[in-house]
Amino acid sequence: MVLKYLKALTSSNDNLEETLLNVYLERKQNFEIFENRSSLVKQEIEKLSSSPSTIQISTSDSDNNHYSITFSSGYGSGVICKRTGMFFNNSLGEIELNPQGFLGNTYSERLISNMSPLIVSNKESIYALGSPGADRISTALAQVIYNYINNNDWSTAISKPRFHVNQNGSVRAEPESIEDNKNVTFTNANDMYFGGVCVTGINDDVVAYGDKRRGDINWTN
């Protein structure tokens, strides 16, 4: 979905909001298996007093190894695939994607995940990146990659204001991210709603970039 959002951002379509909404609806219609998702999610949310949080860890070293993982508290199978270092997911237990509960109506069906840990590269460098943020993960990553393509600076790409088009066509946006209209609800700048993209990689040296929306955590040694 990140690639679909990125394609929408780079298209020449004059109505960007409509294009992004169509991507969202394509995801819902073709990749989500529950027609009653909206009402079931609402019921489950009302039952919850709190929800677990998602973390993104991006790591790179001077030997050109790169690692990206997006993980939620209370989720995951606890099993790593041999010789790969990859965790098996357990999206069957993710309420947003499977509101009917663990193993509910999933036989022979393919479940999606909002999580999008990425390894991206250009001719000079390789980078690991990802973000928490539920269904804003794809749009946050697409916008950051789009910004990087335009300015070749990860710090600037991460800090630029973001917006997200919801299923109903409404838009939540940080100031100066999109033109104001009747569909837009503006948040504060650097709102954690829009994820927390973190990037590591190698330029001339190992680099790391955090996101002010989620604590701006980064460390190099």
Located regions from the model:
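Short Gly/Pro-enriched turn/cap motifs at secondary-structure boundaries
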Residues: 47-50, 106-112, 188-192
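Alpha-helical support elements that line or immediately flank enzyme active sites
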Residues: 3-10, 129-152
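Short, solvent-exposed loop/turn segments at the edges of secondary structure
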Residues: 52, 81-83, 112-115, 136, ...
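Active-site rim segments in enzyme catalytic domains, especially the processed small/beta chain
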Residues: 65-127, 150, 154-155
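Hydrophobic, well-ordered secondary-structure elements that form the walls
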Residues: 2, 64, 117-119, 141, ...
